[in-house]
A protein has these predicted regions:
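Short, charged N-terminal helix-start/capping segments
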Residues: 1-5, 9-12, 17-30, 199, ...
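C-terminal catalytic domain of Rieske-type non-heme iron oxygenases
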Residues: 70, 151-375
Length: 375
């Protein structure tokens, strides 16, 4: 079901913010860690047999890759005496080993061995684990407040299924820790009007479509490139009216696609909450190859577009790091509808203190709802 917000009002002159947000506005959830798949590492940063310490969702985590190559994500603390497995922990075969007393733990969090005990292991002891997977060179972890299983899977990216595009990794990787709630990053999809001011575009951008459905947000923005100039490196044949497509999957994964009239490109971003204040912003992009180029390093216009976009992304940081969330913002008629739709959609990813039969994505017994699996 696609969520829509009526544009009708008994008083056509009513303030758009009042009409779309209501008298109370739309609050930001007091629980800061939304449901969804989140990037917790680049795959290349975790070799076979390696252990990596991490801190996400307000928790200390440990990532490890077994000798067979399987990735696991779990809470960091050994359930023997509380040692941090991410500090000095090692991998033996398919298990992670505590550096303090050598207790071994399987990837599913169960105790595999107490090396000095006649009981062998404690079958009733378990470390909390996070569902994890590798997706186009990223390690993803599923976060859900109550530990419920994933109800959707990350999308297939057609651009990365062939050799027509340069690889996402490693030459386009960028990671920044930003003082911002991940939802504020997603709100860029409802805000084409900042492009002219923050990113110094010569002409304003406008939204041509905006919809939210299930765990998926899809928006199309019309933007003008090369205005007032006969030719630029990005628009060698003159100004271009380009259609930029935004897709967000829950609040953790984002895609931005640029058309071939510029440089055909797919950007892949991850907004992963570290704690109450900070978010790790993962960024990569893949552009169509330059004619005849079979290498992995972007060249020509693809390389220039990568450098440009990496700088453009950083231009948003100063606003995010210094802003205040307004529950009832004062918006122009052109922007109120989409902002309100996005914020209402985002609320479904913040379950309450206890599981509820009304929680999006789950049945009354807490199982993933098949109806919610559709993008």
């Amino acid at each position: 079901v696609t969520d829509t917000i009526s544009d009708s009002a008994s008083d056509p002159a009513a303030d758009p913010s009042e009409r779309e947000f209501g008298q109370a506005g739309i609050a930001l959830s007091t629980y800061r860690f939304p449901t969804g798949w989140f990037i917790v590492s680049f795959s290349s940063d975790l070799a076979a047999g390696q252990v990596k310490r991490a801190h996400y969702f307000g928790e200390e985590l440990v990532l490890f890759r077994t000798e067979s190559g399987q990735v696991h994500v779990m809470e960091a603390y050994c359930q023997h005496l509380g040692a941090n497995l991410g500090v000095g922990g090692t991998v033996e075969g398919e298990n992670i080993v505590c550096p303090w007393h050598g207790w071994r733990w399987r990837g599913d969090g169960t105790n595999a061995l107490i090396p000095y005990s006649k009981i062998g292991c404690k079958n009733n002891v378990r470390i909390r684990t996070y569902p994890s997977m590798e997706w186009y060179g990223f390690i993803l972890a599923w976060h859900e407040r109550h530990g419920r299983a994933p109800y959707w899977q990350p999308p297939v990216l057609p651009e990365l299924e062939t050799n027509e595009y340069y690889p996402l990794h490693p030459h386009t990787q960028m990671l920044n820790r930003v003082k911002v709630h991940p939802q504020m990053i997603i709100e860029n999809a409802a805000d084409p009007y900042h492009v002219q001011y923050v990113h110094k575009a010569a002409n304003p951008a406008t939204t041509s479509s905006f919809e939210v459905s299930g765990y998926h947000l899809h928006a199309t923005v019309n933007a003008h490139f090369g205005g007032g100039r006969a030719s630029t490196w990005l628009t060698p044949n003159g100004p271009v009216d380009a259609k930029i497509i935004y897709d967000n999957y829950s609040l953790g994964l984002g895609l931005v696609r640029f058309p071939s009239e510029l440089v055909a490109t797919v950007q892949v971003t991850g907004q992963t909450p570290v704690d109450e204040d900070y978010t790790d912003y993962f960024y990569t992009q893949a552009s169509v190859r330059e004619p005849g180029d079979t290498g992995d390093v972007p060249t020509g216009r693809a390389a220039k577009f990568l450098a440009l976009q990496q700088e453009v992304i950083k231009q948003d940081f100063f606003t995010w790091e210094n802003m205040k969330y307004l529950e009832k913002p004062n918006l122009a008629p052109e922007e109120a509808h989409d902002y309100a739709a996005l914020r209402r959609w985002a609320h479904r990813f913040y379950p309450g203190e206890r599981p509820s039969p009304s929680d999006f994505g789950y049945t009354a017994d807490g199982a993933p709802d098949p109806a919610a699996a559709k993008a």
